[in-house]
A protein has these predicted regions:
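Conserved small/polar residues in nucleotide/adenosyl-binding loops
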Residues: 276-278
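Secondary-structure boundary elements
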Residues: 168-240
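Short, solvent-exposed loop/turn segments enriched in Ser/Thr/Gly
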Residues: 49-56, 118-121
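Asparagine-centered strand-capping/turn motif at beta-strand->loop junctions
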Residues: 57-63
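Intrinsically disordered, low-complexity Pro/Gly/Ser/Thr-rich segments with frequent PxxP/GP/PP motifs
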Residues: 75-115
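Terminal connector regions
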Residues: 100, 104-152
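Short acidic/proline- and small/hydrophobic-mixed sequence motifs that coincide with surface turns
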Residues: 64-69
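Low-complexity, acidic Ser/Thr/Pro/Gly-rich terminal tails and inter-domain linkers that flank the onset
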Residues: 25-51, 77-79
């Protein structure tokens, strides 16, 4: 089917991501000014998708002499990642350099075991000819493995919570095929192969009906969840607990749609979520 004719399930408008920009100067040393642009939070989804925590690091030499043999070391507190030092040959007097590539490796094992939100730090140390010229910590929130960060920071990471290969949705898919067979005499979940919009709509409706039969109870969302995010129940938790917020249910529906080959798009609207189709 031509791309423009595809039917996409739309649940939730993704807003611009927030990046912290922090200007700092170590008053004890008074040799460099540093501007650090970084994400104010991190979670397992960000780690798995390889998103960069530090977007840019600008270092200005405020002295009348060049700074030579510079080493930039980034560490984390607690130890959720590690990075090799960055070497800079020199910064001329009263000039600056901008770094945008950081070999910061995040630990998948650390994030998968994190069940509660923590407060942490990024620590940046700069030396010139083995002499310290800057040392500063930058606060960062470390989210639980099943926690979405909200709209302010990489909202597109919500897509990481769509799990079309989860075994918990298999009963829903099977039931949807049965419902589709009752409606059309053809139980095949054949995504866009029919090249018929009505067939696609019926598959979507069958999935929706199968989910409603699960008798999942609505659970209210936290206040201001669009900005600050929330814990997400994945498909197995929704099915086992028979509880779900509007976000949990939207992710479950999107997971089922993707499992049968239909394209799903998640959008966030202000206030409670609602289903839309385009």
């Amino acid at each position: 089917m031509a791309e423009e004719k595809r039917i996409i399930s739309v649940f939730f408008v993704i807003l611009q991501s927030l990046i912290y920009t922090v200007f700092a100067m170590d008053e004890r040393l008074d040799k460099v000014k540093v501007q650090c642009d970084y994400l104010p939070l991190i979670n397992f989804a960000i780690q798995q998708n390889g998103a960069s925590i530090i977007h840019q690091l600008s270092i200005e030499n405020t002295t009348p002499a060049p700074l030579k043999d510079i080493q930039v070391q980034i560490t984390t507190e607690p130890t959720f990642g590690n990075a090799a030092p960055i070497a800079v040959a020199q910064i001329p007097p009263n000039e600056s350099i901008c770094l945008s590539s950081f070999n910061l490796t995040l630990s998948a094992n650390y994030f998968t075991q994190l069940t509660e939100r923590l407060s942490g730090n990024l620590k940046i140390e700069i030396t010139s000819e083995a002499e310290s010229v800057f040392c500063q910590t930058y606060p960062i929130d470390i989210l639980a493995y099943d926690q979405w960060g909200g709209l302010n920071v990489l909202p597109e990471m919500l897509a990481a919570f769509i799990t079309p290969n989860h075994t918990a949705i298999v009963p829903i898919i099977k039931r949807a095929a049965s419902i589709l067979g009752q409606w059309t005499d053809n139980p095949s979940l054949d995504e866009y192969q029919s090249r018929t919009p009505d067939r696609v709509r019926k598959q979507m409706a069958a999935i929706y009906t199968a989910i409603t039969e699960q008798q999942i109870i609505y659970s209210t969302i936290p206040a201001s969840f669009e900005e600050y995010g929330q814990r997400v129940r994945l498909a197995d938790s929704v099915m086992a607990q028979k509880l779900g917020t509007c976000l949990d249910m939207a992710l479950l529906y999107a997971s089922c749609l993707e499992a049968i080959g239909l394209n799903a798009l998640i959008i966030i609207t202000q206030g409670r979520s609602e289903e839309r189709r385009v």
